[in-house]
Structure formats: C-alpha cells, structure tokens
Amino acid sequence: MKQFIVFILSLYTTLSWAVLEVTIFKQEENTFPIVISDFFVVGDASQGKVIADIMRNNFNRSGEFSVVNANYIIRSKPSFDKWKAKKIEAIVLGKLEKISKKIFNVEIELLDVYSKKTLYKDIFTVHNSGIRRIAHYLSDQIYHALLGKRGFFNTRLAYITVINKDKGEREYRLEISDSDAQNPQTILKSREPLLSPVWSPKQDKIAYVSFKNSRSEVFIQYPFIRRKIQKLPYFDGIASSPSWHPNGEILLLTLSKNGNKDIYSYQLSSKKLTRLTIDMGIDTEASYSPDGNKIIFTSNRSGQVQVYIKDLKTNKINRATFKGRYNAQAVFSPDGKSLIMVHKIDQDYRIALLDIATKDLKVMTNNQLDESPFFSPNGDMIIFATNQGGFGVLSVVSIWGRQIFELTSKVGEVREPNWSHYLK
C-alpha cells in the first residue's frame, strides 16, 4: 500500500560549513554483508542516488554491516547465485519516480540472497524536503527486517559547539543534526556558556542550560515551530541538569534554592515544583527511568561521588555503584536494565556500562576525559564527548565495546551530545 510521508522541517538554516565530519572505524569481524543498489530513476532526478548513498552510509555507520555497492542499478530479480558466491546475504533494490517538480514515489525491496525471498517491500510518496528522512526511515525498516530489532537512523542529535573568537572570546552554539551528523542547524548562538541540551520524548523541544543572565538557568527551545523560547522560573540559586519525564510534561532539575543542590521535578503546565531528594550532600545529574517510576542521580552523600537510584513510588533510595571512587552522569538504557556513566580509573575519566541486576561494570573506552554519555534509542550505541589532542569531539561506541565512529567539527569543539527518541 502506498503511503504519503510528511516530514517536519526546521525553521533554522542549514550551514554546510557546520557539518560535523564523520570518521567511521572499519569493523572487520561479525558484520552482515549487504548490497545496496543505486536506485532506478524514472524522470530527471538525482534523489535516487541521494537515498542510496544515505542508506549505505547508515549501514556502514551501524558497525553491524559491511556494505557493498553493486556499481550498477539492479532493476529486477538479481542473480542470487552470483551474489551468494561473493558471500552477500541480502540485497536492497530501489526505484524513484518523479511525479511532479517536488513529489516522488519511492519504492524499496529487500531480498534474502539464500532463500530468494522478499523480506521487506513498500512504496511511499514523498516531498523533496523529505528525501533524507525517507532514507533514514527505510534504513530503519531494513535494519529491523534483517536483525529483528529497531535501528537508530531516523533520529536526531543535539550538541553544543564552542568556537574561539577574537580577543579570547567564545561563541556557544546549540545545534541539531540528523543521526548521521548531516543536515546541521544552529538553533541558538550565545556569548555565554550553553550546557546540557536534551530532547523531549516527542522531539518537539529541547531543554538546555544557559548563563545568558549571568546565572545558570533552564530554557526550552522549539526547533520546528515559531514559538518564543520558554524560560523556566528563577528558583533562587543554581538551576541545572534538565531531564525529561517520558510523558514530556515534567522536567527533572538540580536546584540550589535551599542552599544545597538537590533534585526537583517541575511540572510545566501547573508550574508545580516538587523536591525529590533531601540530603546534606550534593545531589545532581538526575534522569528518569524509561517507565518514569524511578530516577537516577549523582551524589557525594557517601563521601564519594556515586550513582543512586530512587523509587518514586516507595521513595526508597539505593546506591547503584560500588566499583571505584567516582561514578557520575548516569542515564538509563532504553530497556531500563543498564546504566551508562562516567567512571574514573586512576586519573582517567572513561565511559562504563553497568548491569543494574548483576552490578557488573564494563569499561567501554580507553580515553582520558570522557563525559556526557547517552544511549541511542535502540540501546545499541552510546554517544559521548571526549578530548582528542586537546580538542573536544564526539565519539560513538557500541554496547559491545567497539568504537564505531567519531564526530568532529572544522570550526570548533563539540560537546554535550544528546540523542533523540524515534521520530514520529
């Protein structure tokens, strides 16, 4: 059945020089060999090649596939024996038909080389502005058909770029991009620091911290509609570390309104503020579990910097980390079974994965200054900020510990990454 796909456009300008450079680290073992053919195009259009190229890049970037370009257009049933001899396991065929100046039909078919069966097939009508989005969407569908789990391609990133200006000044930019770091848009520029951008569950807004009024305050930005930036009330003292409830209506905040940093929840519609932790220590960096029934936060209440979990139904607080003297910036995995965090080893800050049930802690990186880890929405990837040669970059590893790709900027340092949920 043909589907018509409508995609939301950002109100902000895409700047080619702001595109992050993606360095993919080759994966030699246990990858799935797949052919993605150039699309057969009906009418004068270059969009067929664009879709195929985006899809190839997506699968190469996944760390789970080795992608082969057929170097020619496969229009119908391919020679399965030929591809089987090359140890190819699946083939993607595509067709793009130009309906009008900016409207296209996009057909896709995924074939299993060994069974010779169609694993996925569909047709869509799409506007020219949605070409990139349909390529990501189709990548997710094929990923699921082959591996039985959701992909992460039809998602977005948010991050902060820091640019050194003349006379020692700096410019801070809140930026967003597609998951492949393409289609970047600068949402906000500031001479004062910007921190902690975090997508709402519906991907319609971003909460972040700004020092524009010479103090740490939380704001909400709407990238895709014309709406004024929303500033949360001034709560006295510091406001930091925003994090969304799964319903998108509540924010977790770190506030020092009573002289000490504690965790609060703030209901956006009712403006109700609720204190969730009361301790003489510093409580900060809180985030919700996927079901919204628990929060995780960093605290020095034990005399060390450790991670704690609070059950919001029972109000019981349990310490989650015991290995090492410093564990911080933890977030739940999408299935709620694991935590990703910053773990200190000697003088190095690295990314570590904790199994909540078994308490098994696995160090994922071998860097010196890792920070701000966050899961991809399918839970298979972890994006984080790190330092390479004194320069801030973003890096992505799989939950199996393989470095997949790195994101760098030509114009400045990149920090504070956040990965959106799935786009609707």
UniProtKB/Swiss-Prot annotation:
Q: Does the keyword Cell division apply?
A: yes
Which GO CC terms are listed, alphabetically? periplasmic space
Reply yes or no: does the keyword Cell cycle apply.
yes
Highest rank taxon of the organism = Bacteria
InterPro entries per the UniProt record, alphabetical:
6-blade_b-propeller_TolB-like, PD40, Tol-Pal_TolB, TolB_N
Q: Which GO terms describe its biological process?
A: cell division; protein import
Classify the main location.
periplasm
Q: Where is the signal peptide?
A: 1-20
The subcellular localization recorded is: Periplasm
Tell me the keywords, alphabetical order. Answer: Cell cycle, Cell division, Periplasm, Signal
Classification via PANTHER family = PROTEIN TOLB (PTHR36842:SF1), PROTEIN TOLB HOMOLOG (PTHR36842)
Family of this protein: Belongs to the TolB family.
Protein task: Part of the Tol-Pal system, which plays a role in outer membrane invagination during cell division and is important for maintaining outer membrane integrity.
Note the subunit structure. The Tol-Pal system is composed of five core proteins: the inner membrane proteins TolA, TolQ and TolR, the periplasmic protein TolB and the outer membrane protein Pal. They form a network linking the inner and outer membranes and the peptidoglycan layer.
Name of the protein described by the UniProt record: Tol-Pal system protein TolB
